[in-house]
Amino acid sequence: MFHRTFIRGRFVLLLIQGALTVLVLLAWLIPEIPAIPAGQDRQVFSPAPPRRLVSLAPSITEILYFLEAGDRLVGVTSYCNFPPEVKNKPRVGTYWEFNLEAILALKPDLVLAMAHQGEGPGSLQVLQNWKIPYYLGRADTLPELFRLIEDLARLTGQEEVARLKLPPLKARARQVQQRVQGLPRPRVLLEIDQEPLITVGRASIQGDLIQRAGGANIAENIDQRYPVFNLEEVLKSQPEVILFTGMADAASLPRRMNFWRQWTMLPAVKAGRLYWVEPDLIDRPGPRLVDGLELLANLFHPQQN
């Protein structure tokens, strides 16, 4: 009886050892998945390197082209309009609402989006439910944008491209901040919309740009990214520069500017410092954000041009 039990136990032990050996071999054969550091939002990875990408954010689309991985994009949103080469890519919806069937039909290895897109009822949870590999990035400041570019470079295997193209981008941003350092900061109102009056708070990418470009955001003490402001608060803050941006039709710009021109006691109105800023340069956390930073610095400190 003891001999039979010993043989059975030895047989089980051999089976376990064999299974462990197979697992080790399989682990050796599985391709390594690029590691993305903590600091971005949720990630669900596909086997590396992903070859069929769907971008649900214009900023990510621009970053992928910056990293010379645009040829891997098989689907984008209707808001993805830069660079021009993206215009012929299949569309899978808007920034907030996407067509799940269209995404599934494209058989992506990975779907990429920004974390803010997952904060509402039309969130990206459905991607997880359908077991679609996805990545959610976050960039609420310029340094976070640079980290996002580095992370996407690792994820797509484009590290060498990032090593060549990212340092000049960072250098331009540093030069702007050095140029405005120590200069008086004009008080700035950035109007996203007028009815109701929506501006940018401390947690927004635009708020970060205003500060780095040498301005003082009059809504800096508000934690919300896009708070609703009121006229009394603006009049009390006495902005020296008023910026207009947002997704409203360009035809509405004269009306929006004329509204503020009636408040002649505002320093910005007295000095004629009311400016339109192309939304994609300051609203979209992609490589062109540095263009937006340079533009804002020139508007805030024209004497330094």
Model-identified regions with their sequence ranges:
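N-terminal Sec-pathway targeting helices
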Residues: 5-17
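Bacterial N-terminal signal peptides
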Residues: 16-32
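Extracytoplasmic substrate-binding proteins
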Residues: 46-52, 110, 121-198, 219-224, ...
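A short, structured surface patch at a secondary-structure boundary
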Residues: 51-106, 110-123, 218
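His/Asp/Glu-enriched short active-site or ligand-binding loop at hydrolase and phosphoryl-transfer sites
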Residues: 77, 203-226, 246, 276
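Short helices/loops that flank or line small-molecule/ion binding pockets
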Residues: 100-107, 130, 229-238
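Alpha-to-beta junction loops
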Residues: 106-111, 215, 237-242
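A ligand-binding cleft/hinge motif common to bilobed small-molecule-binding domains
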Residues: 118-129, 241-259
